[in-house]
Amino acid sequence: MGQDLPLLLSAALGKKVNRPPVWMMRQAGRYMKIYRDLRERYPSFRERSENPELSYEISMQPFHAFKPDGVILFSDILTPLPGMGINFEIIESKGPIIEDPIRTLNQVENLRELNPSESLSFVGQVLSSLKKDVNNEATILGFVGAPWTLAAYVVEGKSSKNYSLIKSMAFNEPDLLHKLLDHFAKSIGEYLKYQIKSGAQVVQIFDSWAGQLSPQDYDMFAGPYQKKVVEIVKAEYPETPIILYISGSAGVLERMAKTGVDIISLDWTVDIEEACKRIPRGIGIQGNVDPGILFGNKKSIKERIDDTFNKIKDRKYILNLGHGILPGTPEENAQTFFEHGKKLTY
């Protein structure tokens, strides 16, 4: 049966594979000319990510160009928010803006339970089309934002440098924040199940801003809600591999391993050999390559991939960057990353 599964799914399940699978976070996006051309025709990010034809087309752009082992849904971690009654806009170069930041008990109590098949049917449509058309030549990936990161956006109202508003809530009104986090955990768990039902074969949870927490606050406000999302998903889809990514996670790797996820995606600020010692063997590892290396020459890109792989050869591993690919990355360097990655062998 292992032969019938796409490579990334096989590797994520812990089956024996000939080489590590390779894909990139943000592999569909601004570094690709074909994407920038489409963006000129459709300047609204929400339209690009919520119109199923456009989202499908963008999701497939890197697959046509590079044949990665994973095809990830083109969407955004904030996409489920309107289904809960929180509206947002994404302004080019500024990032997301929440129209009415959530800061009171009344607002939290008025949030709707997320019904993904109703408010996010376009996501289901895209995933089922991807699954059908990619036809197991690659693994279909879904993703969500974790409760802490979603809460950080909706409380702050936008991206933040120091997260003073949500931290003020955490330390002054912890019960209010826990209520919000719990609401998000249930909704995000349901959303992930909907993605899996629609065609996602592996899913990734992005807790992008959990790296801003001290370990003790991670244990209070991030870890338990990541775990709750995982438990909701595993209750219905115990076999679907779940990846967890946190930017700036070097201080909480052991804690991430206790959430029930199958794979931990590393940023590039931690030594991968050290990470292997800190993460239990049963848990796979993804990423760790500095996206900045893709601004280097081909030789340096290949050497960095080889160095990373040689340090982790005896572990379940998915080759990826330690963060999303950066805008302005030369496309031919992305090509080198994929081509060289596919030459690795166990």
Curated annotation (Swiss-Prot):
It catalyses: uroporphyrinogen III + 4 H(+) = coproporphyrinogen III + 4 CO2. Its main location: cytoplasm. One of its GO terms (cellular component) is cytoplasm. Pathway: Porphyrin-containing compound metabolism; protoporphyrin-IX biosynthesis; coproporphyrinogen-III from 5-aminolevulinate: step 4/4. The keyword Lyase applies. The record marks D76 as: Transition state stabilizer. It holds the Pfam family URO-D. One of its GO terms (biological process) is protoporphyrinogen IX biosynthetic process. Substrate binds at R26, Q27, A28, G29, R30, D76, Y153, S208, H323. CDD domains: URO-D. Transmembrane segments: none annotated. It is an enzyme of class 4 (lyase). SUPFAM superfamilies: UROD/MetE-like. Its EC number is 4.1.1.37. Keywords: Cytoplasm, Decarboxylase, Lyase, Porphyrin biosynthesis. It is found in: Cytoplasm. One of its GO terms (molecular function) is uroporphyrinogen decarboxylase activity. Coiled coil: none annotated. It comes from the Bacteria. Homodimer. Belongs to the uroporphyrinogen decarboxylase family. Catalyzes the decarboxylation of four acetate groups of uroporphyrinogen-III to yield coproporphyrinogen-III. HAMAP family: URO_D (MF_00218). This is Uroporphyrinogen decarboxylase. It comes from Prochlorococcus marinus (strain AS9601). The gene is hemE.
